[in-house]
Regions:
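Non-heme di-metal
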Residues: 2-239
Length: 239
């Protein structure tokens, strides 16, 4: 139900822009094979972190709604997104419980903090950057869930991540449309390229302790181009 609401809201935004069906490259570099192997080796740890990611994503959407209460249409766009993120949180939480694991605090990687630090102060650029950072995080989550859906040795986890892919694509698609509708394509694209470089830098390096693997821990292939769904079209409604 909520997924259809998000698709409906997204479809109502900037129809002329959607008609162009431009392919937007969100991610500069793909995740590394080492990250995938680390995540496969500690599936329940990544699952716990995934639950925290869904909870935080809901909080980001709500925070943006409260920050810009006078922005017409923003609440209608982000409210169903926040609800869907919480549905995903509950889904992951239930799976953790079935597997005998409890949600617990985990030290967060520096990924989110580095992206947040790149958000400029003052409006309206703060709004643009906040939307794009949220979209970049969703895009990276989508890319890594796709890897786990394809390569996890656990059928239960392959099914979970596969089911969530369409939602993640809708989410970063929605953030793109919110930016483009308010700031235009040229401004949005230029800033996306800058923040995408920050996103790659935040994931550059090698994990010193395997137990620190997270959904957004370090591990990208520099000089390689993301493939397939990584060149996602955020203007396309994914159902």
């Amino acid at each position: 139900m909520i997924a259809s609401v998000i698709a409906s809201v997204t479809a109502s935004l900037a129809p002329a822009l959607r008609a162009e069906q431009a392919r937007i490259k969100w991610l500069v570099a793909p995740s590394s094979a080492s990250w995938l192997e680390q995540a496969k080796a500690r599936p329940d740890l990544v699952l716990i972190d995934h639950a925290h990611c869904e909870r935080k994503a809901a909080g980001v959407a709500l925070q943006l709604m409260f920050r810009y209460p006078s922005d017409a249409g923003l609440g209608a766009a982000l409210s169903p997104l926040a609800r869907e993120e919480l549905e995903h949180f509950e889904l992951v939480l239930q799976l953790l419980q079935r597997r005998g694991n409890a949600l617990r605090p985990l030290p967060a990687p520096g990924y989110g903090a580095q992206l947040t630090a790149a958000v400029r102060k003052g409006e309206p650029v703060r709004m643009l950057d906040s939307f794009l950072v949220a979209g970049l995080i969703e895009a990276r989550s989508h890319e890594r869930m796709a890897l786990l859906a394809a390569h996890s040795p656990d059928p239960e986890l392959r099914e979970l991540y596969g089911e969530l892919l369409a939602s993640e694509a809708r989410h970063f698609g929605l953030y793109w449309l919110l930016c483009e509708e308010r700031f235009g394509r040229e401004v949005t694209m230029a800033r996306l390229q800058e923040l995408a470089a920050v996103e790659t830098q935040a994931l550059t390096g090698f994990l010193k302790h395997p137990e620190d693997v997270r959904m957004h821990s370090v591990g990208v292939e520099l000089g390689s181009s993301p493939v397939g769904q990584l060149h996602a079209d955020p203007c396309r409604i994914v159902r």
